[in-house]
Amino acid sequence: MMKSRTFRLSVSTLVGALVGVLMAIVGVYVTHSTEEPHTSLHEMLHDAVPLDSNEREILELKEEEFTARRREIESRLRAANGKLAESIAKNPQWSPEVEEATREVERAAADLQRATLVHVFEMRAGLKPEHRAAYDRVLVDALKRGSQ
């Protein structure tokens, strides 16, 4: 009786964790579509700040660099998620293999978040000082909307 209950609890916990990881990955893909290189933050920046040609050129280069970096990290995230799925398929309970695969997913997701923030601040540095306040407002507004 106790073993069966413990097993059900373990499986339920594992399924819940897997659903959480999958939801996080879906969120990453929805917010970082590879088909559209410009994020909504990028578009809002163009609407809020009158960029000159030099700023546009600088930001476009930074955007291209970030797109390549983001794709590399997203590839690692997909691979890590695949490892997690394989680990669970081999042994559908919390195990050292599932733990390690979960940590790989977490590392890749954290790397993506960090790279995105570095990119945001690199973009800001590419603006004229008089345009940075408007950029900051757009950034803060976007983050606030995302947290609601």
UniProtKB/Swiss-Prot annotation:
Gene3D superfamilies hit by this protein: 1.20.120.1490
InterPro entries tied to this protein: Metal_resist
Keyword set includes Kinase: no
Biological processes annotated in GO: response to cadmium ion
Disulfide-bond pairs as recorded: none
A Pfam family hit: Metal_resist
UniProt keyword list: Cadmium, Cadmium resistance, Cobalt, Nickel, Plasmid
Family the entry assigns: To A.eutrophus CnrR.
Its biological purpose: Component of the NCC cation-efflux system that confers resistance to nickel, cobalt and cadmium. May be involved in the regulation of NCC.
Name of protein: Nickel-cobalt-cadmium resistance protein NccX
Organism: Alcaligenes xylosoxydans xylosoxydans (Achromobacter xylosoxidans)
